[in-house]
Amino acid sequence: MAKKFNYKLPSMVALTLVGSAVTAHQVQAAETTQDQTTNKNVLDSNKVKATTEQAKAEVKNPTQNISGTQVYQDPAIVQPKTANNKTGNAQVSQKVDTAQVNGDTRANQSATTNNTQPVAKSTSTTAPKTNTNVTNAGYSLVDDEDDNSENQINPELIKSAAKPAALETQYKTAAPKAATTSAPKAKTEATPKVTTFSASAQPRSVAATPKTSLPKYKPQVNSSINDYIRKNNLKAPKIEEDYTSYFPKYAYRNGVGRPEGIVVHDTANDRSTINGEISYMKNNYQNAFVHAFVDGDRIIETAPTDYLSWGVGAVGNPRFINVEIVHTHDYASFARSMNNYADYAATQLQYYGLKPDSAEYDGNGTVWTHYAVSKYLGGTDHADPHGYLRSHNYSYDQLYDLINEKYLIKMGKVAPWGTQSTTTPTTPSKPTTPSKPSTGKLTVAANNGVAQIKPTNSGLYTTVYDKTGKATNEVQKTFAVSKTATLGNQKFYLVQDYNSGNKFGWVKEGDVVYNTAKSPVNVNQSYSIKPGTKLYTVPWGTSKQVAGSVSGSGNQTFKASKQQQIDKSIYLYGSVNGKSGWVSKAYLVDTAKPTPTPTPKPSTPTTNNKLTVSSLNGVAQINAKNNGLFTTVYDKTGKPTKEVQKTFAVTKEASLGGNKFYLVKDYNSPTLIGWVKQGDVIYNNAKSPVNVMQTYTVKPGTKLYSVPWGTYKQEAGAVSGTGNQTFKATKQQQIDKSIYLFGTVNGKSGWVSKAYLAVPAAPKKAVAQPKTAVKAYTVTKPQTTQTVSKIAQVKPNNTGIRASVYEKTAKNGAKYADRTFYVTKERAHGNETYVLLNNTSHNIPLGWFNVKDLNVQNLGKEVKTTQKYTVNKSNNGLSMVPWGTKNQVILTGNNIAQGTFNATKQVSVGKDVYLYGTINNRTGWVNAKDLTAPTAVKPTTSAAKDYNYTYVIKNGNGYYYVTPNSDTAKYSLKAFNEQPFAVVKEQVINGQTWYYGKLSNGKLAWIKSTDLAKELIKYNQTGMALNQVAQIQAGLQYKPQVQRVPGKWTGANFNDVKHAMDTKRLAQDPALKYQFLRLDQPQNISIDKINQFLKGKGVLENQGAAFNKAAQMYGINEVYLISHALLETGNGTSQLAKGADVVNNKVVTNSNTKYHNVFGIAAYDNDPLREGIKYAKQAGWDTVSKAIVGGAKFIGNSYVKAGQNTLYKMRWNPAHPGTHQYATDVDWANINAKIIKGYYDKIGEVGKYFDIPQYK
């Protein structure tokens, strides 16, 4: 007989919940079917925060600590790779926790050019950093290169040479960009072959290797612009990163880091610049944002390409990278912009393992235009970039041909531009080595380090003399390095398994991330560690070397027995809850009590425990050694923090007894960090920032910081260029006695100490002689710039915008016409008065307008308010700016009429008042005249009362509070969005209901009822019509079945199927909607409620804690687990559940040790009791709770996580209709939904997480 658990979960649901539904004929075939859940990453929304942050770390930080990393070698010294030499997958999948990255880490990577091999999207090139920490202690020559071999010149080396391209990393670097230096080039040396692991090494002289020839690319279309690009060997600039923290991060439909192609756009704005487009996008990202902008000089990536953007409609957004071409106006600039776009597109395709394939004519491929998306996919109606390209006598076909050529160059398939395609070696114009030939001497030394092989590499070498390496899959793993070899200009490491010592071979220095390591030492120390922390099989391990995760709830005890230092980081080996492995010391907390910060004793004893709090305006840096962060100053101990050695703003100080505390917050946002003890920080007084307009000079290489008095952890970039650069300051702040200025230089913004700035020397002016023939005019207005607070509407007919009041002619100001802008500066020049307009976010100056071209009103100060209003039936809509025009309307009057407007602040504009707030999930400004305030209600506060219910947090932009209605002690809900919140108390204050309960991290807090929901429903577009999918189902070879007469099955017709699949109808039914309940999502049902339900259920009684733990550990809905166990065990009474032992292959029910199986795992039909107990014994399930937790792991890994995670998906598979389905009964999902709903009713809960497909 077959195993029960050969069936997938849905069949198990059919067996365990109903037992009567017909399973599909394709059940066995499903065993080999790939996971087809296209929306998996989006649906797993409760973990989206952790997933995206982890994915960011995957791409941005290839290792935990690379401060000792060797950089890539110069392209000239890299050995050639053969066409069949596979070097690993170009897609990076390594998982790294960014918290383990050393603060001084800088990833130095090679610049992207037209002549590169597979490359990363990082761009800086630095000189190699030499690690010479080598010792001969304990060195054995047993495995050295053979020094006694004859010198043999390999004739094959004369026929091939290194491609003029560097092997470059597939990692993206998150390190701040710094000034770069090019590494010196050196010739590759050809060397004789010898056996690898032999006696000793001797020097050899070798011949120089000539270059390899590659075929030239044959253009597929004629293009004078492409020929111009090739002829001039145009280079693409570095890819700049200008990311915005508040942009949303959602996975593509296939997951994080898995785009399916790239879309070509143009900005459709002839007057815009790349900076202007980016600024506008940042202010209007709710409507649209893209991944990158390209013009003739720059490539600026504005959003991480691992996550989708909003640039091409609902169908294309989850699939493609979106890149905008900024308009240029001359031949050369246009050619450069096409070259830049093609290079960026080819880089993305290569980076994500995609090949160029035009979708323009068939709707299938990896390179799309916006027009093609509109034509073939829908969801948008744009037709760019064809019109713009035609205006330059260019076409999409020409651009695609250039992208394809770039891709082939990067892949090493065709000759790079500027090289000769010939078998004759090319003679360089200048010698790259001294006239005296290199000796090619071999040196070998012992090494005690570690290394990780990069995804793109030259392979493993049996000997360092081998011409080519052998492809290896051992990438992105940490190995021990036992030897270093240098042959000519090539350096190699001998890598071996860290734990067994088995040697893998030699790898080139440029193909690894290397770190020095000290020898491990024995320790005997206990630490506390958080649940979920990863353990690794080696120190500095990667995602491929995970030994397990820490289980349990609350901090666990980690007993360390070994310690090793890798570079500057400490790793410990130990055990926790039966699991052993290595972990970074950064994740451990010494269980010994921290020594409290000594407080100076007062001259006389004090017993003053009175709390005093006062406002403060300062800044502080938390010391590396500290007592932690305190939620309140009454807390006995603080919580450990990693926010050390960073500058924060200080808003309050508190004194309690003999202790003094500072309240620190993020300098650039309202996010509160917590209270810290005075002795744990370096504090400085600070004056409030003031606006300035001053130009300075600054030297290249000077660091810019995200905050004044910033640390190395808060670098915003470095000044680029050669010679003194111009720094335009817009803000100034005094910290203690030092002055810091905020400004912009070469497109980068940040804070810098005034000590690094110099005032440019004023040009000498010739003294003008008075001319009696010209009568001087009388100045009646002050000739200085005044700071003002006004607001202005630009008239349709205006004289234009000026960068300075001194400009004689203005630029066209048509795009600002009929729009409202803030006014921050005013200046008289001659007889004219000009004002400086800022964009709607207040912080980006646009330019100067003559007041004659504006309607100007005074602007008051913004005042906080908390009030609900009803929008009048007749209103002017929701606007982006107070006193906004029709061109700045977010929602029209009809869209918000008679709706509820939640105001958060207000401002006066002339005699009118405008309120800022939220309506219909959009935020903006409404004129107070368009609002009606509710009847005033006398403030009331009800007493807090007990209230037990588990809600779901629905507003990640909301806050949780230490006390209800507090404006200060509030913290962001972003990290807890879509997670359960177990409520224990309810209180109403001034009409607002507050709930007090436990967050998912165990912290107790108050949350507004408006930020919570009883259930979280998500809708997913299938992209198909209901009639279409119903037709597919009805036309299957194995017809869907229906019982029109009880017990008699007949084939279902089209109408039967359509009725059963209609998600709109099903979602309205309170019971049937449970077929959309996510079975892979626990919902934190209280242990008490579970135990009440399990009362009288045999051995399952009082096992609520075990079911709760199992659900949390393995991500399974508790109610499903319980229902499965109840049916398998006959309500907890079966012998398999009550337990037994198997002795001499016989079942013994009265043994002292009994083994339990509550899910029927491996209970084969021929002898279910014996086989089930045998499996439980092998698994170690000697208690019922172990059987519950262990069995849940099996079910979660084998069934629930298989992809189709709701009953509806199991039955109908809306992602791929007609395939991989688990039942033929059209009512199968309905029947099971009612059963699960019944269990929920008995427990006294409701389902929390629903995922509902939608059809066109």
UniProtKB/Swiss-Prot annotation:
Region (N-acetylmuramoyl-L-alanine amidase): 199-775
Domain notes: The GW domains are responsible for directing the proteins to the septal region.
InterPro entries: Amidase/PGRP_sf (IPR036505), Amidase_domain (IPR002502), GW_dom (IPR025987), GW_dom_sf (IPR038200), MGlyc_endo_b_GlcNAc-like_dom (IPR002901)
SMART domains, alphabetized: Ami_2, LYZ2
Lineage: Bacteria, Bacillati, Bacillota, Bacilli, Bacillales
Subunit description: Oligomer; forms a ring structure at the cell surface which is important for efficient partitioning of daughter cells after cell division.
Source organism superkingdom: Bacteria
Post-translation changes: Undergoes proteolytic processing to generate the two extracellular lytic enzymes, probably at the septal region on the cell surface.
Entry keywords, A to Z: Cell wall biogenesis/degradation, Hydrolase, Multifunctional enzyme, Repeat, Secreted, Signal
Domain GW: 443-517, 519-593, 612-686, 688-762, 784-859, 861-936, 943-1017
A GO term for molecular function: mannosyl-glycoprotein endo-beta-N-acetylglucosaminidase activity
Pfam family, any one: Amidase_2
Gene Ontology CC: one annotated term: extracellular region
EC number annotated for this UniProt entry: 3.5.1.28, 3.2.1.96
Gene from which this protein is expressed: atl
Principal location: secreted
Protein name: Bifunctional autolysin
Function: Endohydrolysis of the di-N-acetylchitobiosyl unit in high-mannose glycopeptides and glycoproteins containing the -[(Man)5(GlcNAc)2]-Asn structure. One N-acetyl-D-glucosamine residue remains attached to the protein; the rest of the oligosaccharide is released intact. Cleaves the peptidoglycan connecting the daughter cells at the end of the cell division cycle, resulting in the separation of the two newly divided cells. Acts as an autolysin in penicillin-induced lysis.
Signal peptide: 1-29
Ranges annotated as spanning the membrane: none
Catalytic reactions on record: Hydrolyzes the link between N-acetylmuramoyl residues and L-amino acid residues in certain cell-wall glycopeptides; an N(4)-(oligosaccharide-(1->3)-[oligosaccharide-(1->6)]-beta-D-Man-(1->4)-beta-D-GlcNAc-(1->4)-alpha-D-GlcNAc)-L-asparaginyl-[protein] + H2O = an oligosaccharide-(1->3)-[oligosaccharide-(1->6)]-beta-D-Man-(1->4)-D-GlcNAc + N(4)-(N-acetyl-beta-D-glucosaminyl)-L-asparaginyl-[protein]
